[in-house]
């Protein structure tokens, strides 16, 4: 496992983020060399808890920006962080791809008119985020 992590935000959150990202990458993306920048900032105006953006290339991406809403409490923050890390996993493993501005989920073209909440990568991330957070907290004995 190799992840280069940069973080802008509060010291307490930096420790939380480092631990969670290291755990997630070692459990789900161990063989990949990744660069993940995490920006902790106010996203209330945008109406977001978090966002994940590919920074390098859409084919075999390895560099990501995760923006996190710094007004969330620690539980919501951690859940959102795992949600965004699930998107990193989806991109790295090729489950969710974008080719020529068209989105594919496991090789199937996704209708561009699909509502956000029904996009398959969002459905999966919402389904998994709390369970992954519970696994993480159990391993920490929190």
Predicted regions located by residue number:
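Active-site recognition of the HExxH zinc-binding catalytic motif
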Residues: 79-91
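Soluble non-cytosolic domains of exported or imported proteins
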Residues: 11, 15, 75-76, 80, ...
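Catalytic zinc-binding patch centered on the HExxH motif and its immediate surroundings
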Residues: 39-63, 74
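Zn2+-dependent metallopeptidase catalytic core
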Residues: 12-33
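Long, well-structured alpha-helical subdomains associated
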Residues: 115-118, 129-142
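Hydrophobic or amphipathic, alpha-helical segments that drive membrane association/targeting
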Residues: 1-12, 34-47
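Post-HEXXH active-site segment of zinc metalloproteases
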Residues: 75, 91-123
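Short pre-active-site segment immediately N-terminal to the catalytic Zn-binding motif
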Residues: 63-81
């Amino acid at each position: 496992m190799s992840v280069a992590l940069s973080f802008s935000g509060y010291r307490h959150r930096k420790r939380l983020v480092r631990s969670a990202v290291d755990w997630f990458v070692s459990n789900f993306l161990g063989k990949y060399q990744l660069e993940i920048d995490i920006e902790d900032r106010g996203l209330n105006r945008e109406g977001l808890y978090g966002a994940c953006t590919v920074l390098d290339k859409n084919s075999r991406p390895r560099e990501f920006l995760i923006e996190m809403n710094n007004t969330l409490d620690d539980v919501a923050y951690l859940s959102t962080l795992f949600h965004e890390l699930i998107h990193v996993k989806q991109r790295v493993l090729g489950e969710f791809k974008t080719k020529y501005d068209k989105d594919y989920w496991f090789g199937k073209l996704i209708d561009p008119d699909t509502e956000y909440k029904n996009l398959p990568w969002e459905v999966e991330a919402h389904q998994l985020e709390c369970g992954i957070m519970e696994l993480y907290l159990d391993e920490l004995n929190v």
